[in-house]
Amino acid sequence: MIKQIQKIESKTKTKFYLGKETNSKPALMNNKLIKIFEDYSKSKKIKSLIMPSGAGHDSSVFANYGIPSLMLFVRNKNGSHNPREYMDIKHFMQVFEVLNGVITNKL
């Protein structure tokens, strides 16, 4: 991977900074929370997708310490973590509506 990065850097005259490894371990998200969020989404006719993710962020650290966790993702036209990253405000507001609704009414 380092060789590929070096090729890209040379070709594009850019520099990658990979940062420190977090060494966080993969974790399963909480099935009860997933069901609550899924049911709320359905009740509001907001399409949702349950999927595995390699993203860890803080949720995997919390989950590995026994803290019930899950992650909500906002649909992103060009994928995340790239210069062309783009999110439609409609999709952002749908996730906000679900998060706010669950926190306000279900938890």
Located regions from the model:
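His/Asp/Glu-rich mid-to-C-terminal helical/loop segments that flank catalytic regions of hydrolases
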Residues: 2-4, 74-107
